[in-house]
Amino acid sequence: MSGGLDILSLKEDDITKMLVATTHLGSENVNFQMEQYVFKRRADGVNIINLGKTWEKLVLAARAIVAIENASDVFVISSRPIGQRAVLKFAKYTDTTPIAGRFTPGAFTNQIQPAFREPRLLVVTDPNTDHQPIMEASYVNIPVIAFTNTDSPLRYIDIAIPCNNKSPHSIGLMWWLLAREVLRLRGTISRTTEWPVVVDLFFYRDPEEAEKEEAAAAKELLPPPKIEEAVDHPVEETTNWADEVAAETVGGVEDWNEDTVKTSWGSDGQF
C-alpha cells in the first residue's frame, strides 16, 4: 500500500498507460468478492475497475515479493499464452522462477517426483486457468498473488490485483508495472528516472506475425542488388560468305544431266 506517500502514489503517465491498455475494463459478470474493486457499470454491461485500488494492491504485492530474501523462491506462473512472455520477462529482470505453460500436477505436493518445488510465494496470471498451482499452494500454506478480473474467484488468493487479465496488452502492462515497482523497492532503479526497459517487451506476440515481422526486417537489411552498366561492344561487319567460298561440286560433275545413268546391272545391259 502507498500509505499516503506521494512517492508511492499513482502517476498520470501510469494511468494513461492503463487506460490505453484497457486495464480498467472488466467483464460483464462480477464475483461478490470483487464488487469492492468495481467503480461503476457501463450501459453495455461492462464493469469498470477502480484503477486507484489496482495500484494500491500492486504496490502491496511488490512489497510482498521484495520481502522474500531469496528471489528465486518466488514463482511466477502463467498457463495462458498471452501471459507467458510477460512471465519470462518478469523473471529475467527480478531473478524469480518462471513457470510458463502447462503446470505439472503435484509439483508443490508430491515430494517423490523430479519436478517437486518448495516456493515461498506464488504470482499467477489468471486464477481460472492457474487453478491447479493455487490449489496445491493452499495445501502447503504458500501465499498467492493473482491478477484478477471482476469475475475471478478469490478462493485461496491472499493478494488480488484487480485488472483486465484477458487482454494481452493489459496483462503485459501489469507484469511490467509490477517488475518496475519491485526493482524500485529493492533500490535497483531510481524513481526519478525512467526504466529503460520498454513495456512492449512484455506484450504477447503471435508467432506467425512475429515471423512475418522478422522476415520483413531481414529483407530491409539486405543490400540492394547491384545493377551493372551495359558495356557497348563493337559490332563486326557481316560479310557474304557466298562470295568468298565457291560452291563445291558433288562427285566432280558440274551438270547432272551429263552424268550417264545405268539402265542395267549386267555388262551386256541385261538385268
From Swiss-Prot:
Residues 249-271 are annotated as: Disordered. InterPro entries: Ribosomal_uS2, Ribosomal_uS2_C, Ribosomal_uS2_CS, Ribosomal_uS2_euk, Ribosomal_uS2_euk/arc, Ribosomal_uS2_flav_dom_sf. It comes from the Eukaryota. GO terms for cellular component: cytosolic small ribosomal subunit; nucleus. It is found in: Cytoplasm; Nucleus. Residues 262-271 have a biased composition (Polar residues). Keywords: Cytoplasm, Developmental protein, Nucleus, Ribonucleoprotein, Ribosomal protein. GO terms for biological process: ribosomal small subunit assembly; translation. Pfam families: 40S_SA_C, Ribosomal_S2. The keyword Nucleus applies. One of its GO terms (molecular function) is ribosome binding. SUPFAM superfamilies: Ribosomal protein S2. Gene3D superfamilies: Glucose-6-phosphate isomerase like protein, domain 1 (3.40.50.10490). Component of the small ribosomal subunit. Mature ribosomes consist of a small (40S) and a large (60S) subunit. The 40S subunit contains about 33 different proteins and 1 molecule of RNA (18S). The 60S subunit contains about 49 different proteins and 3 molecules of RNA (28S, 5.8S and 5S). Interacts with oho23B/rpS21. Required for the assembly and/or stability of the 40S ribosomal subunit. Required for the processing of the 20S rRNA-precursor to mature 18S rRNA in a late step of the maturation of 40S ribosomal subunits. Required during oogenesis and imaginal development. PANTHER family: 40S RIBOSOMAL PROTEIN SA (PTHR11489). Belongs to the universal ribosomal protein uS2 family. This is Small ribosomal subunit protein uS2. The lineage of its organism: Eukaryota, Metazoa, Ecdysozoa, Arthropoda, Hexapoda. The gene is sta.
